């Protein structure tokens, strides 16, 4: 869980503990929920991927050096490595990043918005996409409002901006907005549950589900 050397090396661990100690949980959820773990055992999965990549890299290096290498990974280090720009923000500002829920910690507008029949995830990840997003919603006038002219200002006034956006997105269905936004070039998608996701056309198109045939048991499906 913590690597083969150092203070924590002999401590027992599972994914949940790694999520807690790595700081990962502290960034999930909102101020109301407190720390929240991810539904999937992400440290187990990421550590396994890093290990596989390390093994392949060591095998490739052996062709040139004729020497083997020790490949090691840990649950906690794997999660810490995923902090990316969040850790960069801390190193530069010395400020601990706060939970942002479904909002983005450094971008606005960005997140989950209400529709006539549910919710929609929308990700205008730069100024150009923000302009496209607001124009698609017929809210381009906001681009001229002093409160929202830059991303920094939109972050400061995010609650009010989200309120205005929600008032518009609630007028039509999720599918309506997904079509409109994707056609305009703005990334948007529906929030699917497990059943919906595994039966979505994307899963079929990418051959993600396998049929496992057993001689004495019914055929099972698996990813």
Residue ranges and their predicted role:
Residues 90-97, 200-212:
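Short, surface-exposed loop/helix-turn segments at secondary-structure junctions
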Residues 108-184, 188:
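Aromatic-enriched alpha-helical interface/lid elements that frame and gate functional surfaces
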